[in-house]
Amino acid sequence: MAKISVMGTGSWGTALAILLHNNGHQVMLWSAHPEKAASLNQTREDPKKLPGIIIPDGIVITGDEKTALDSPDIVVFASPSAYMRAISKRLSPLVRQGQIIVNVAKGVEENTLMPVCDIIKEEIPQADVCVLSGPSHAEEVSRGLPTTCVVSARKKETAEYLQSLFMSPVFRVYTTPDMLGVELGGALKNVIALAAGTADGLGYGDNTKAALITRGIAEMARLGAKMGAKLETFAGLSGIGDLIVTCASVHSRNRRAGYLMGQGYTMQQAMDEVQMVVEGVYSAKAAKALAEKYDVEMPIIMEVNKLLFENKPASEAVKDLMQREKQEEISWEL
């Protein structure tokens, strides 16, 4: 049995706390807002984020970070990527040397172009930062539906240790050395999912969605390869796996936000309607900047940025994608 603190009471942090508790671990769930911790302690449910899911009494819920970071074996960072630097800075003085931190947030910081793990490493240099990612909606994990993810760490032994902690009969975990590829897949797929949702909102069909998914993963892999990630990572759980579920699922807030924009909502109206953090909106500008920095052609990413930040009509964005110059899918040159 391990002592595990999950930092963040959003849907994903709560779902992972329940999973780890059911695996027999001693779990503490921390909220950055003491009033929310008090409310969850009283009701044991978050009807807004995970309706109908009861947090087991064995999970200790606290709003005190000193208590949460009192010698845990591992710490899970589950705050949204947009808040990760502030949270990391706040918690850094309490994190011991060599502490294993598992990041489960997905995103790239706009002003630094850093993936989330790099943000945590910069603010908490004494920690051993790892990442868990893959096609894993909290709504399904919290209900015990079969799910598969991937974990990456600096050392193989650490990845295998985390694999053993998270693995269960309904939650299968693979390991990989490619932390950068795992993080890029998790961040970029949210932007592509906005495009897929927009196509749904416009009333387009499965052909359109299949095109966005396959051409989207091509964009993600091109950028990843230029940045030093492994191409095969994008054919795995944190790449195409996460992209498929985020583009297709009714649980996907990125897909839903895109759907609403396809229906005529503005970006802000769509975010207000979703009522939860839409990570793709925060990662879109960073994805565009990375494409420009590494000179990688990413037309879907570019059109999503125009849709979000230049008020380009969704139908015009799709038309411009369809009317691009003729291309090879695979090079004819050996």
Stretch-by-stretch model annotation:
Residues 1-53, 60-63:
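NAD(P)+-binding Rossmann beta1-loop-alpha1 motif at the extreme N-terminus of oxidoreductases
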Residues 9, 13, 33, 84, ...:
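Generic structural signal for well-ordered, non-membrane alpha-helical segments
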Residues 55, 61-70, 74-144, 162:
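Rossmann-like NAD(P)(H) cofactor-binding subdomain of soluble oxidoreductases
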Residues 70-71, 188, 240:
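Alpha-helix C-terminal capping/helix-to-coil transition sites in glycosyltransferase folds
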Residues 83, 94, 119-127, 146-232:
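Internal alpha-helical scaffold of NAD(P)-dependent oxidoreductase catalytic cores
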Residues 196-197, 225-235, 243-334:
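NAD(P)-dependent Rossmann-like dehydrogenase/reductase catalytic/cofactor-binding core
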